[in-house]
Structures are given as C-alpha cells and as structure tokens.
Amino acid sequence: MGEVSELWKITAFRRLLIARVVSNIGNGITPIALAFGVLSIPGADAGSLSYVTTAQMIPLVLFMLVGGVAADRFGRSQLVGITDIVGSIFVGISALSFLTSHASIPLLCFNGFIFGMLNALWYPAFSGIMPIIVPAKLLQAANSTVGLAANAGFTVGASIAGVLVSTAG
C-alpha cells in the first residue's frame, strides 16, 4: 500500500489515472450503445454492424506502426491527450446522430475509421507513458493501479450502457 500512496503524490500519475477511468467509462458505453444503435437504424442488420466495427478495426491494424513512430517523434502525453479528445468528439458526433435520427451506416463507418486511426496512434503512445511519469521502482504498482482502475471504469461504462439501452432504447 505504501507504493500506491507514493504514486498519489505524483501529479502526472493522478491525472493519467483519472483520465483512464473517465475515458474507459466511455469505452465501456460505446460498443454496447453502438451495437444497439446500429441495429435500430431502419434496414440495418448484423451485416451493417459488422461494417461499422470492421471500419474501426482496419485502421487500427494498418496504422499501428505509424502510431509507434508518432509516439517516438511527438510527445507521448500530448499524443494520448489529443487522440483521446478528438476520439471523444467523433464518438459524440455518432451519439448525436442517433439522438437526432440522422445516424447512417456510412457516417458510422467513417467515424469508426477515424476512431480506429486515432486508437492506432493512442495505443503505442500510451504504452510508453508510465516509465516517463513514475520512477522505475513504482512502475509495477503504477501499471497495475492504472490497469485496475481502467478496467473498473470500463465495467462501470458497460453497466451504464445497459441501463441506458434498457431505459432509453
């Protein structure tokens, strides 16, 4: 427990931990809400959902190496922050399209593709952040604390999505 209290003294670690929890709440909501949302579009079916999810996965695979280079060339922290914020904007656009009854498979595929590209930049940048912000002796505790908190955030997000889908449709 001493290591965790040492971690809390590091401002950059606290910010990263809070950001991961908040972001992962959204990451828990998104796939569930998106699946139900896509299937609610008139004429959409399981194939439509597969197009949307594939549109997100293809750039993730294609651009991961670019993400590694970008993480090395530009600041990892800045890249993580920017990609998280821009990704949230595209998820918000998708959510707004559902709320205003303007959602379409092409729009969701486009947004998914952009989100996948952003994730391809995010993952390599995030994987190298921890050694930059915490001392080596606290690295294991930092990684496990952020991992646990991020998973808790994802679980909370998935639970929120379940409530939203069951009550709001």
Question: Where would I find each of the regions flagged by the language model?
Answer:
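Alpha-helical transmembrane-bundle signature of multi-pass membrane transport and export proteins
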Residues: 1-169
